[in-house]
């Protein structure tokens, strides 16, 4: 079992129960899933770019990504409905906790000119979204084999009812928020 999951069970639940005066352990917010999304708009011209992006996402997450397709045609972007334009992975359970641990302890500190993540990126329901400009911050990506640097979106979905609860949950994991 991931260390972070044990830490959540042993420490974070107690901390949040006292902070928010919950009556039941089931009211304590928890991390439900982590979604990684990589939009590859350039895949219209070259299908190999999408395969490389999917391989990078598979290396980062340890799970085969789902190829996302365009929902509708947009002439300005020269895309048609059904064109493959990105890939995504939804992590739950053990893989989610392992990825979350690597994200906090290894990947985020490797971001260039890192001064902390914005605490304002919550959606109003306790879910946190962040963007990464370079996939090379993850140790699983070999810098020499990267065809081009691309970013990805990371969404941490929680069971929190409000942004304050979600912020407290992530802060309990020592999430590197900007001061």
Swiss-Prot record:
Keywords of this entry: Ribonucleoprotein, Ribosomal protein, RNA-binding, rRNA-binding, tRNA-binding
A Pfam family reported for this protein in Swiss-Prot or TrEMBL: Ribosomal_L5_C
One GO term of the biological process aspect: translation
GO MF annotation, one: structural constituent of ribosome
Entries under InterPro entries matching the protein: Ribosomal_uL5, Ribosomal_uL5_bac-type, Ribosomal_uL5_C, Ribosomal_uL5_CS, Ribosomal_uL5_dom_sf, Ribosomal_uL5_N
Listed GO CC annotations: ribonucleoprotein complex; ribosome
Record-stated family: Belongs to the universal ribosomal protein uL5 family.
Complexes and interactors: Part of the 50S ribosomal subunit; part of the 5S rRNA/L5/L18/L25 subcomplex. Contacts the 5S rRNA and the P site tRNA. Forms a bridge to the 30S subunit in the 70S ribosome.
Protein's job: This is one of the proteins that bind and probably mediate the attachment of the 5S RNA into the large ribosomal subunit, where it forms part of the central protuberance. In the 70S ribosome it contacts protein S13 of the 30S subunit (bridge B1b), connecting the 2 subunits; this bridge is implicated in subunit movement. Contacts the P site tRNA; the 5S rRNA and some of its associated proteins might help stabilize positioning of ribosome-bound tRNAs.
Name of protein: Large ribosomal subunit protein uL5
Species annotation: Buchnera aphidicola subsp. Acyrthosiphon kondoi
């Amino acid at each position: 079992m991931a260390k972070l999951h044990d830490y959540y069970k042993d420490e974070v639940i107690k901390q949040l129960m006292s902070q928010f005066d919950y009556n039941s352990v089931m009211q304590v917010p928890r991390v439900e899933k982590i979604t990684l999304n990589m939009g590859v708009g350039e895949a219209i011209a070259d299908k190999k770019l999408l395969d490389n992006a999917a391989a990078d996402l598979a290396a980062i997450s340890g799970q085969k990504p789902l190829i996302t397709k365009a929902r509708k045609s947009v002439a300005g972007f020269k895309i048609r409905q059904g064109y493959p334009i990105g890939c995504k992975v939804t992590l739950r359970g053990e893989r989610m906790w392992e990825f979350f641990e690597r994200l906090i302890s290894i990947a985020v500190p490797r971001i260039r000119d890192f001064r902390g993540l914005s605490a304002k990126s919550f959606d109003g329901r306790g879910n946190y979204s962040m963007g990464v400009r370079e996939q090379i911050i993850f140790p699983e990506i070999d810098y020499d084999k990267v065809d081009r640097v691309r970013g990805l979106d990371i969404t941490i979905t929680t069971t929190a009812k409000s942004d304050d609860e979600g912020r407290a949950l992530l802060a309990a994991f020592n999430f590197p928020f900007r001061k």
